[in-house]
Structures are given as C-alpha cells and as structure tokens.
C-alpha cells in the first residue's frame, strides 16, 4: 500500500512534536497508557447508552510486553478500538485528538474524565522508537486495521488480523547510541518504575508478565525461573478513597513510600475543594528537616496530577517559598495543560489552587499551635527560620500571613512564645515589644543592654537567629505595638531619659573628648541609664544594628557595611570617677581608657577589635 503523508503541517512540525514539546523521553509510556485508559473509558461510556455493548470492568486492562530479542515494546488495551477512518483522522493528522472529540460529544453527561485532549501524546513514542505499528479492532467494525509509520516519511494503513476488540501498539525501540541508552525501555524493572511514577493511579490494571524465581520443588537450594502476571499500578489513589477507609498509618506509609521523607510526617492534611476549580490535595508537614533544606539545592514543589496521571514532579507554583517545607500532591481535572501534557499554562486555576493551599497550610499550622503545642515547637525548631524569612522577603508582602505563626524565646517564660502571647502579658505602662538580638540565648542573657528593661519587669524576646531582626524590622509592629531593641538610643523610659540628659549636659566636654579620641568609630559618647552593673556598652545610632552588621559582614559583596554605634558610659560605675579624674589631670590616660572601653564594648558584642596587641598592652598598663 502506498505511503501517505501526514495531513497536518509538515516534517518540521513532527520534528517539533518529538524534539521540542517533550523534555523527557520516558514520558512516552505515560502518554500511551493514558491513551489506552481513554479507550477503555470510551467503551464504558458507550455501554451506558448501547445495550449491545457489554462492559465488565474486571475484563478490561492494559498489558505491557517488552521483547528484548526483537527490540519491541507492546502496549495492548481492551478499549473501544479505532476504525480505519479513526486511524486516518486521529493518527494521520497531527494534533487531532479523538479523546477531545469524544469528550465534546459527551460533555452533557456527568463523569466524563477523558485524559487525552490534544492528539500529540502518541507521537512522543517516536523519541524512543524507529517504527510504530498500531493494530486496532473497533467496536463498530467487523474488520481490524493496521497503521504503520517510521515517522516523518508518512504512514500506511491496511487490513490486518486481530480478533479481540481494542488496540495494540508495537514500538520498534531504537538502537543505543553513544549518548542515549534505549535498552532501558525494554527492561522490566525500569518499565515497572516508570508506571509507578507516572501511571500508578490509572483506574484499570496495567499488567506485565514478570520473570520471577522460586525454590525448585523437591530441593532445598535449587531455584527455577517462572513467569507470572503482575499488576503494576495501585489504581485507586489514597486521596480518592473514602476518608473513613484511610487510617493515619496509611497516610504515613504513603508518605514514606513516595520518598517525601524517611520518618512519619508530623501532620497529614487531606483537602477536597469543589467550585470554580475542583481539586484534591494531600499535604504533609515533615517531622524532620531535609538534609538540604536550607541550601540552594533544595527543590520545593508539590506533585501535580491530572485525573490521577502525574504531569509534574515538582510544581513550585503551588507553594510559596515560606511554606516550601510542605510535601505532597494536588490532583485536579480542571487544569489547563499545554499540548504535551508536561507543562501547565499559567492560568487563574493554578493560582487559585495555590492560594487555597496557602490558606489551608496556615490554618492547619495555627490549629497545631493551639491544640498540640509540643508538636508545633518541634515543627518550629525545624522550619521556623523559613517562616521568618517569609516575613522579611518580598519587602514584607507576606508579614500579615505569617505574623501569628512566628515565635521567639522569652526572657520571663524561658521558652518559645508567640507575639500574641507576649502582647497579652504586657504591663499597663509598657509602650513597646522589647527584643534583644545576639549570637545565642546564653549570650543574650548576659547582655548589659538588657539590665534596665529587666529591672522594669518587662519581658524581652531573644533574637538568636540571624534572620530575626531583619524580619522584625520588616514587621515593624504587632497589634499596634512597636518593636524596640534593647540597643535603641530611646527605650521609652521618660524619667531615665531626663536624668540621662542631665548627665550628658554635665559631662559634655568629657564625652566630646572621648568621641574625638575614637576618631569616627562612634557617632556619640554619652551617659547611659540602661546600665546597672556594667561600666560600658554599645547602642545603635541608626537602623542598621550591631547584630545586623555581623550578619551582613558574612555575606558576599557586603561592601563593608557598618552599624553606626553609640558608646554609652555608666556614670554610676566607679570607672567613671577614673574617667573624670583622667580628663582633669591626665589626658593621655583618658585616651587609653577611651580606647580600652570601646574595645571592651566590642568584645561584649562579639565584634573584632582592630589592634589586639595594643588592647593587651593597655590592659597591662591599667593593672600597673
């Protein structure tokens, strides 16, 4: 029979189908299995309106037959089959979909969920096959026909022998090249894995005659090979089962089987939404942190299914970065896929699903916080930093979403507390939410700057994570209460500020002299009423704090960003009498004391001093 040319487009179009639309060769099997499932669906829907067509679900299946000797891979279905006209129209015309036409014809009926809608998935098989043979026996025909093609050269159609209804696709697998190993598509183990990966939830059994080994009868140590049909897919997704049928252990097993994590999840969340866009989500909050979570190598995203067929392993658009720790999947019939079924069109359906998922995750986290505090603390120790990054990123666009989820260590409660809990305990005369940043809890406890706030009986939040202060500066306030660092020049204590101003006026010349000695290292030297037992400390003179300076200094291209500092002197400390005496009688000694006290303040903050040798010499002079 003469070779026919493809009706639509040209050699270039077919090349595009094979080489450009699909980015992953292995998805050809997903496409052919989805087509086979569609064919069985069509037979079922026809049986609903045609009493001459029988349909017993247990008799319908998809069979996979690899043959290494002949280098063929065969996919057989027991579906509706194709007539000669349908072979011509559906396979002879690129991008013509029989499934789409059938769906349009039946769209008034409920329950139609045909997967294939574009008519190009079939051609993905040319990525791994030199030749494709399709034998099909239509339910509407007494004769069977064969469609055969080697790709761009065109195709042939002729009658053939095939008694059973349905379609048989025979792929002649390409020979290996230096760059490509096509043998893998003939290996039973690999085929089984591909079906588990992409087509595990096709609702009809996918069978393959598998080679197995058993103990030879009558022997103790001799084994023999045998072949047995094995169903490779589980068919019914766990998220489509009745909730009453699924136990917590089932979700936990699914979580581990899918390699979402190696331990039981902290929380399993199942959500079914119907409306403008309908979908089912099965989400998991991990109980442990992935080893690469806080690295660039970590890839966020949920598995995305269309009618139970995996179309994307990591759909990043479904999760905001601050919830990137969430694992799981989404299955929807309403997705607008592009013609390769590999990629999504970025439309409002996807955005709406993502918005709903974000709200669901927040709701579940708040529920855990309220009802299972210990579980939330465990979660927060693993992923709290990510939530705080979320507050800081995008110029604070998500701060209102996350502000009730973040926690900090409390000076009075000696544990992690929420901002809401802090505000609920604020004293009547307290204006601000006070916080103290530092390297760790133990060091923050000893900071001189916290003394006056403690004496007032005010609770202090400890910021021991590098992102904490950046997040709070973006948050700015909570329930109309501003945040105030214990390093701030103004702590909001009016009585102490008046006394402080008096001390500054009385000792103005001393402080100006010390500032000049330090030669630009500080913006100001002044009296301090925040100090009780310590002689000296540093305070912030600008929005860039001392702790932020440390963080920024470790970043690439930091441009040597420095915090503007204030050196504060405790005028009630004995050291200040020595300072005043030196100012009056020994200016050289005061120069040494100024440098010494400044370096002491730097060491308290964990900042490097410029000249350690000179500092050591000054200490020795003071001892003498």
Curated annotation (Swiss-Prot):
Gene3D superfamilies on file: 3.30.230.80, 3.40.50.11260, Heat shock protein 90, C-terminal domain, Histidine kinase-like ATPase, C-terminal domain
Presence of keyword Nucleotide-binding: yes
Signal sequence, start to end: none
Region of interest (C), ranges: 551-624
Keyword annotations: ATP-binding, Chaperone, Cytoplasm, Nucleotide-binding, Stress response
Entry keyword Ribonucleoprotein: no
GO molecular function annotations of the record: ATP binding; ATP hydrolysis activity; ATP-dependent protein folding chaperone; unfolded protein binding
Protein name, per record: Chaperone protein HtpG
Pfam families linked: HATPase_c_3 (PF13589), HSP90 (PF00183)
CDD domains the UniProt entry points to: HATPase_Hsp90-like (cd16927)
UniProt source species: Clostridium tetani (strain Massachusetts / E88)
UniProt region (A), positions on chain: 1-341
Span list, region B: 342-550
Location relative to the cell: Cytoplasm
Oligomeric and partner information: Homodimer.
Family from the record: Belongs to the heat shock protein 90 family.
SMART domains: HATPase_c (SM00387)
Function: Molecular chaperone. Has ATPase activity.
Any one of the GO CC terms: cytoplasm
InterPro entries: HATPase_C_sf, Heat_shock_protein_90_CS, HSP90_C, Hsp90_fam, Hsp90_N, Ribosomal_Su5_D2-typ_SF
